[in-house]
Amino acid sequence: MISRSRTASALAAAILLPMTPALAADYDPPIYVDQAPDYQPVEVGSGWYLRGDVAYLPQKTFDNGDFTFPSTINNESFSEGEDAYFASIGFGYHFNDYLRADLNLGYLPGNHVSDSYDDSGVAPAGTAILGSGNVKNYAFSGILNGYVDLGTYVGITPYVGAGIGLVRTTSKLSASYTDSADSTNDFVLSSNKNQYSLAYTLNAGLAYQVTKNVLVDLGYQYFSAPNAEYVAAESLTSYPTRKGISNHQIKFGLRYDLW
């Protein structure tokens, strides 16, 4: 009896065994679909900012020095003026909460010097001297500044920084001189010279957060271009080229974060 049962079980297994793959084929393997990541909008301009500044210059950038006339007469004049402001625009980038940098293009209005002299009304015949001159100096600058923001306290962020770049100085001169006693001294000058030189800045200031994107910036900047050239007026016959310009700037600016 037991032998028959074992024989029947073996026979049933032999019959069902070929059917197993067929049955398995009726069931497809499960398909696993990865869940799509949540949509994250791309922030265009994140970290970038725009800026604009105006500055008051308490000292002269182009130092003309003293002017000397041949003698003191009524018909002589000398004037020297220099615009005491500086303006710049630029853009920058926040690398993190403490480091940032910006590139600024600036304009220095510069100075204007004029002189004139005519002693023909008082000098002996044949000895009169007539002379006049006009000098104009101004500059454009392109400076890359780097800053360290020293933390924010009640909305105020102090910072220090330094920069390096180029300055383009323009010097214009027109002058004439007539010596009735010796015509070999006569001359007429006219020049318009542009020159590029290295410049650097030292910066410090405070920024105040007005809104999420707008900051008011009150700062100090020392600007120097040791090799920049400009023209000066020393006398009716001397208009030398001098080297080196610098200034101290009290700056007021706005920064707009492009978040």
Language-model segments: which ranges?
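Extracellular/periplasm-exposed beta-strand and loop segments of Gram-negative cell-envelope proteins
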Residues: 58-82, 107-141, 167-197, 225-249
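Bacterial N-terminal signal peptides that target proteins for export
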Residues: 1-9
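Repeated loop/turn-to-beta-strand initiation elements of outer-membrane beta-barrel proteins
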Residues: 98-101, 154-156, 208-216
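Outer-membrane beta-barrel biogenesis signature
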Residues: 23-52, 63, 259
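Short, contiguous, helix-prone interaction/anchoring segments in small proteins
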Residues: 44-90, 94, 100
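Bacterial N-terminal signal peptides
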Residues: 10-18
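Transmembrane beta-barrel architecture of outer-membrane proteins
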Residues: 47-49, 84-86, 139-143, 157, ...
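Residues on the lipid-exposed face of transmembrane beta-strands in outer-membrane beta-barrel proteins
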Residues: 52-54, 89-93, 142-148, 162-166, ...
